[in-house]
Amino acid sequence: MKFEHRSVMPREVRDGLDLKPGETCVDCTLGGSGHAVTSLAAVLPNGRLIGIDQDLDAIENAHRVFADDMANVSIFHDNFSHLPAILDSLGIKGVDGILLDLGLSLHQLRKGQRGFSFKGDEPLDMRMDMRTALTAADLVNTLEERALVDIFFKYGEEKMSRKIARAIVRQRASAPITRNCELAEIVRAAIPAKIVHQQKIHPATRVFQALRISVNRELEQLERFLETFVDFLNPGGRICIISFHSLEDRMVKRRFRALEQGCTCPRDFPECVCGFKPRLKSVTKRAVMPTPEEIEINPMARSARLRVAWRV
């Protein structure tokens, strides 16, 4: 099966990483390998690309894409939060560029048959790594109403979380909810028509986002990554992180800011006693957004936010 995907902000990522021949880079979320192809071209002939993805479809696609370049490429079917262990297995102490693209691929939405989208008729699964056990159907059919409310509000910032959770619990009492289209219709029916008409997005968007985040423990994995990545970035090396919703972007922004700050002593201390030094410097003050031209060509890019920083 062809892996269908269009990389987001390819020029901005290429310029942000600013890779040179002979360097080592990591693409933490290969997806369709679009960014990875550009990165490998920049570090050849003697450089190295390390590609990671938890989706087996993306891994199989990467092996096809890089079939003639495996002397310079290492591919791992794993989660990006395990970057320290992956680099250790290769005997690599530091890299010159890291890319983390947190978005879903078009392939996952349209051809994955895993219920990521509220369109079509697919199993309510939402696992990115099919080796894991928990599915979205498990959450929807087994969690107490209060727990569903918490997930929808915390991970989807859904204001109608109580009404939606109540509707789900009422519906599943008759029969389990097992298809994406079933859940999408339950959510749509639970929200007052006036609010539905006012929304610019599908009424089930935030609920599906929240379930996907919960199933894949996305924010936990991101937190683990943000705590450790700087330890493996060579001086002068760059990191690019593309996020697609405010929860992720706030986490990235806070971590970059903390690493830029260095000293954590109270402001009224006459001198630093903590010993922390700045370890990172943001390349741009604000997140980079896709151009209107790119959004017209690739509507999935509309909510993307790119943050770039370099290792001091």
Curated annotation (Swiss-Prot):
InterPro entries: RsmH, SAM-dep_MeTrfase_MraW_recog, SAM-dependent_MTases_sf
Entry keywords, A to Z: Cytoplasm, Methyltransferase, rRNA processing, S-adenosyl-L-methionine, Transferase
Domain of life assignment: Bacteria
Segments passing through the bilayer: none
UniProt GO MF annotations: rRNA (cytosine-N4-)-methyltransferase activity
Any Gene Ontology biological process: rRNA base methylation
Enzyme class: transferase
Location in the cell: Cytoplasm
Cytoplasm among keywords: yes
Functional summary from the UniProt entry: Specifically methylates the N4 position of cytidine in position 1402 (C1402) of 16S rRNA.
Protein name: Ribosomal RNA small subunit methyltransferase H
Gene name, Swiss-Prot/TrEMBL: rsmH
